From Swiss-Prot:
Function (record text): Required for rescue of stalled ribosomes mediated by trans-translation. Binds to transfer-messenger RNA (tmRNA), required for stable association of tmRNA with ribosomes. tmRNA and SmpB together mimic tRNA shape, replacing the anticodon stem-loop with SmpB. tmRNA is encoded by the ssrA gene; the 2 termini fold to resemble tRNA(Ala) and it encodes a 'tag peptide', a short internal open reading frame. During trans-translation Ala-aminoacylated tmRNA acts like a tRNA, entering the A-site of stalled ribosomes, displacing the stalled mRNA.
Superkingdom as given in the UniProt entry: Bacteria
Gene Ontology terms for molecular function: RNA binding
Protein name per its UniProtKB record: SsrA-binding protein
Species of the source: Wolinella succinogenes (strain ATCC 29543 / DSM 1740 / CCUG 13145 / JCM 31913 / LMG 7466 / NCTC 11488 / FDC 602W)
């Protein structure tokens, strides 16, 4: 499965415990697809919300590309519909209703058929001490790798 990752949401991995990952298609306009191919995407603070039985990607910033139609300037942070099966949406709706659970966007990529996809995750927020533990663990892992590299 060759997938070309365009953008990652590193902040989501730091702020949340990831419980389950899903792949969802994204309903985009042509100029947005061109902008994604050019790498003009920012997923910081983006999340998924289920509204009236449909999943939407909110706060994802897809920049306007200057080479597209100059008379049409789309909203760069508009809600984008995510394409999921009904059973998946129902399952996510039930899971998100639990306190502390949320849906976050982890990455946007093109799959082997050149379709734009979003990797979303069911996540639970971390506390401050969890974030500190994550940082300590990363530092220890780095030190261990450096020590192994020396020998």
């Amino acid at each position: 499965m060759a997938r070309k990752v365009i953008a990652n949401n590193k902040k989501a991995l730091f702020d949340f415990h990831i419980l389950e990952r899903l792949e969802a298609g994204i309903a985009l306009s042509g100029s947005e697809v061109k902008a994604i191919r050019a790498g003009r995407v920012n997923l910081k603070d983006s999340f998924v919300k289920i509204i009236k039985g449909e999943a939407f990607l909110l706060n994802a910033h897809i920049s306007y590309l200057e080479t597209t139609n100059p008379h049409y300037k789309p909203d760069e942070r508009r809600p984008r519909k995510l394409l999921l099966h009904r059973k998946q949406i129902d399952k996510l709706t039930g899971s998100v209703s639990t306190e502390g659970m949320t849906l976050v966007t982890l990455s946007i990529y093109f799959n082997e058929r050149n379709r734009a996809k979003a990797e979303i995750a069911l996540a639970k927020g971390k506390n401050l001490h969890d974030k500190r533990e994550t940082l300590k663990k990363r530092i220890l892992d780095r030190e261990v790798k450096a020590a192994l590299k020396e020998h």
